[in-house]
Amino acid sequence: MPFRALVAALVAALVAALATVAGLAASPLAAQQAPPDYAAAMHAAHGSETPSASPAARIQPRTAVTSEVVTYGTLDGKALKGVLARPSGTQGGPALLVPHEWWGINDTIKAVAARYAGEGYTVLAVDLFGTTAGTPDSAMKLYQAAMRNVPAGERNVAAAIAWLKQAGATSIGAVGYCFGGHWSLRAGLVGGTDVKAVAIYYGAPITDAGALARLKAPVVGFYGALDTGIPVDSVRRMQSVLTGSGRTMTMHVYDGANHAFANPSGRAYDAKAADDAWGKALAFLKANLR
């Protein structure tokens, strides 16, 4: 083939390849592969709710608990304040880091922290917002702001882990719900070998193998089969990455349950699924932290 004809053929092939790539980028398949908008999904799930704790959410701890506000570090010159709950009259022992849901540290999260403390854990509810949301719209904005600055959130979580270690924690786990479920997973990434167990309730997954390489702890996940905002298939992809590299992730999927099925203050509360998940979470934490 003459040289000019060869060049022309190569140019034509390159143009065709670029056109194909452009077509794929604009195709429905490419759109499906884009990262989901979890903030919008959370707004859809919680848009008709309020941050107020229902009477059912105020489940009393099994044993006496002491709760107080503590400063667990600083970030960009601002004090990081969280709620510390622990069995009355105790110091040290196994500890849990509990990131809040998308409302911030409200009464529901305080009750959750106290309930885990009633099971014998020192519990630190960390504040990733620096405030609480009063409406779904303000919660969505706080959620989006936090996810736009993940490095700051991870430094926040790292400060909480360091504080628990200095306070005498013999082992540390992380438990979170919704937005907090995603951040309990990130606590596992940040903490490395310092975090011995991660429990995720319907939290957004991370499927990138490089990002998950930091995770050393076993993971348990609790998800509703009807959750369209965080589909079970997306979480199974994370599970596949973890198990494929020799780590452990156990999933419990509840038929008929939706997102936030374990939140007694929410419209999707499913008492049967929530009770089952609670028992399984406690067994998982006991096996890995005690």
Give the label of every model feature segment:
Residues 8-27:
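Bacterial N-terminal signal peptides
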Residues 35-63, 69-165, 265:
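Serine-hydrolase catalytic machinery in alpha/beta-hydrolase-like enzymes
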Residues 158-216:
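Primarily recognizes the serine-hydrolase "nucleophile elbow" in alpha/beta-hydrolase
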Residues 215, 221-223:
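Short beta-strand/loop motif that positions the catalytic acidic residue
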Residues 226-230:
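Acidic catalytic loop of the alpha/beta-hydrolase fold
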Residues 243-290:
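C-terminal catalytic histidine-bearing segment of alpha/beta-hydrolase fold enzymes
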